[in-house]
Swiss-Prot record:
Swiss-Prot/TrEMBL keywords: Allosteric enzyme, Cytoplasm, Hydrolase, Metal-binding, Protease, Sodium, Threonine protease
Organism whose genome encodes this protein: Chlorobium phaeobacteroides (strain BS1)
Superkingdom: Bacteria
Signal peptide stretch: none
The name this protein goes by in its record: ATP-dependent protease subunit HslV
Compartment(s) of residence: Cytoplasm
């Protein structure tokens, strides 16, 4: 696919899971430009707020880093209230002339909450505590839901196994997994 006459940069599958008071968020490491893999070990997740929140991104890297910085500012402004910071970021993202052009999505987990924040102004808190974004997200989400339902694996193991399953299916996802747990 092309965007603005240039090959589209595709990257990533990010998956977060909350289970038994623990949260884990992981991503693969593949970055693809058009139909070419250009990097195998891209880091797409980051810890925030004294390491109690983990965020991941899918989409344009520079845009995502800008949004992560803004999200961290919102967390500081609102005293670490995750939902409030997410809603305020989504509102700014949708209404600000500069921010609205940014093309990325964020997945955010803490031991209590899992959220997806999009540029359309959506802040989504899935009922099952599983968040997934990126090109292989639906494969990883399906695997995580199945593992949650049929195993006693912890959050980190569910994320790892689900991303490996997605990597077997999605051509834009690889098995170089980066994982953080809180």
């Amino acid at each position: 696919m092309e965007r603005y006459g240039k090959p589209e940069l595709r990257a990533t599958t990010v998956l977060g899971v909350i289970r038994n008071g623990k949260a884990a968020l992981g991503s693969d490491g593949q970055m693809t430009l058009g139909n070419t893999v250009i990097k195998h070990s891209t880091r797409k997740i980051r810890r925030l707020r004294q390491a109690q929140i983990v965020t991941g991104f899918a989409g344009a890297t520079a845009d995502a880093v800008t949004l992560l910085d803004r999200f961290e500012e919102k967390l500081q402004t609102y005293g670490g209230l995750l939902e409030r910071a997410a809603v305020e970021l989504a509102r700014d993202w949708r209404t600000d002339k500069y921010l609205r052009r940014l093309e990325a999505m964020l997945a955010v987990v803490s031991p209590e909450k899992a959220l997806i924040i999009s540029g359309t102004g959506d802040v989504i808190e899935p009922e099952d505590g599983i968040v997934a974004i990126g090109s292989g997200s639906m494969f990883a989400l399906a695997a995580a839901r199945s593992l949650m339902k049929h195993t006693d694996l912890n959050a980190a193991d569910i994320v790892r196994e689900s991303l490996l399953i997605a990597a077997d299916i999605c051509i834009y996802t690889n098995d170089h997994i980066v994982l953080e747990e809180v």
